[in-house]
């Protein structure tokens, strides 16, 4: 059985979003959400959740290269907890080290410097977070 999964790449100004299916293990970028000091428009997040009806939501966990936590790590955990508390969705965290760099590299290769828009990078990062979550077998399939 395939499950639908939404992924978020949390940031204080922009939150990337992607959707995927466990049967294919691939993700598709969705429009990023603007945030102000890490606070998104919760109504837009709610609409996204209602539109896609995910079985699970994955939030990228920004860790330092040595695996230690940083300020943004705590904010991402808080965002994940709020998703669960507000909407009752199952939320899992996924290590997101190097996803932003990898997303920038992919976008640059496709469209050059002009294609490197922050929201696009964040949503491609969300795709990479979700695909790595699928690769790790986290969906239990």
UniProtKB/Swiss-Prot annotation:
E.C. designation(s): 3.1.-.-
State the InterPro entries in the record: RNaseH-like_sf, YqgF, YqgF/RNaseH-like_dom, YqgF/RNaseH-like_dom_sf
Q: In which domain of life is the source organism classified?
A: Bacteria
Q: What's a single GO BP term from this record?
A: rRNA 5'-end processing
Q: Report the enzyme's class at the first EC level.
A: hydrolase
Q: By its UniProt entry, which CDD domains does this protein fall under?
A: YqgF
Task: List GO terms (cellular component aspect).
Answer: cytosol
What GO MF annotations does this protein's record show?
nuclease activity
Q: Which keywords does this chain's UniProt record carry?
A: Cytoplasm, Hydrolase, Nuclease, Ribosome biogenesis
Compartment(s) where it occurs, according to its Swiss-Prot or TrEMBL record? Cytoplasm
What is the recorded function of this protein according to its Swiss-Prot or TrEMBL entry?
Could be a nuclease involved in processing of the 5'-end of pre-16S rRNA.
Spell out the family assignment given in the record's similarity comment.
Belongs to the YqgF nuclease family.
Q: What is this protein called?
A: Putative pre-16S rRNA nuclease
């Amino acid at each position: 059985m395939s499950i639908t999964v939404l992924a978020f790449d949390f940031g204080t100004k922009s939150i990337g979003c992607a959707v995927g299916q466990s049967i294919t293990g691939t993700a598709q970028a969705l429009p990023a959400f603007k945030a102000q000091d890490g606070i998104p428009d919760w109504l837009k997040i709610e609409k996204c959740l209602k539109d896609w009806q995910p079985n699970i939501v994955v939030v990228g966990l920004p860790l330092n290269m040595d695996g230690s936590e940083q300020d943004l790590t705590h904010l991402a955990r808080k965002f994940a907890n709020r998703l669960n508390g507000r909407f009752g969705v199952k939320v899992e965290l996924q290590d997101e080290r190097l996803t932003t760099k990898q997303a920038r590299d992919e976008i640059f290769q496709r469209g050059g410097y002009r294609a490197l828009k922050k929201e696009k990078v964040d949503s491609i990062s969300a795709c990479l977070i979700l695909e790595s979550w699928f690769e790790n077998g986290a969906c239990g399939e």
